[in-house]
Amino acid sequence: MDFLMSGLAACGACVFTNPLEVVKTRMQLQGELQAPGTYQRHYRNVFHAFITIGKVDGLAALQKGLAPALLYQFLMNGIRLGTYGLAEAGGYLHTAEGTHSPARSAAAGAMAGVMGAYLGSPIYMVKTHLQAQAASEIAVGHQYKHQGMFQALTEIGQKHGLVGLWRGALGGLPRVIVGSSTQLCTFSSTKDLLSQWEIFPPQSWKLALVAAMMSGIAVVLAMAPFDVACTRLYNQPTDAQGKGLMYRGILDALLQTARTEGIFGMYKGIGASYFRLGPHTILSLFFWDQLRSLYYTDTK
């Protein structure tokens, strides 16, 4: 039941935040491996990107990739939050004094995140391809011509096999390790600290909301460079064997980006990342916490 509640919580958040994921993906691919000032900026900021995409691609384009996004969130977070929830309920994340251990929480969050992200990697790759697809006048990054999630998965599988479907999976793991460990460690530690200070009642929804807000800020700051590199790894063009033509891996993507675009290139789309990851983290953790509270209250 923990896995089902975790997946549903993440899907609930995804419906609201997917347009921000589209904007974030476009901004991360804009000016890829080009020096600042040498390329046309189709998307000047988050709000301009929203208007531009809606005007040129149509309002429906702001929900591009929603199907794979929902499936990925259900698989990835169902496994990640579900596994973490079981570890927490089993007392494995607590010290002898009964308080949360930040180190154990971070380790559990990282391991749970790796399992979910690796299994869901093909879905995330297709999501990235679909969200990057745009009209030629505002296109950024390599443009795949997928018609939908199932067509894309079938085509990639037929051309490149399982290796092609899981291309970039290992490179995407550092992003998830950093993000998941930061998110769950910060969320649990903040909840524990606020409970000790008795700012809110133990089962108050406000406790979960404030902890989720703090977690969202921490995740965005820690995860941004890895998120940019991951988006580019998944979206790069490939040769006949399905091998990426631009980057050899996550480290190469980070180094090339920093060398060509400067340190700020590694934080492209951070505004969109915050507007997306912040609400997504808050909503998914809040829904997860409330669903678990309702379930365990009703089953007592």
Curated annotation (Swiss-Prot):
Keywords: Membrane, Mitochondrion, Mitochondrion inner membrane, Repeat, Transmembrane, Transmembrane helix, Transport
Highest taxon, organism lineage: Eukaryota
Membrane topology: Multi-pass membrane protein
Subcellular location: Mitochondrion inner membrane
Annotated Solcar repeat ranges: 1-90, 100-193, 203-294
Listed GO CC annotations: mitochondrial inner membrane; mitochondrion
Similarity remark: Belongs to the mitochondrial carrier (TC 2.A.29) family.
Function comment: Putative antiporter that exchanges dicarboxylates and sulfur oxoanions across the inner membrane of mitochondria.
Protein name, per record: Solute carrier family 25 member 35
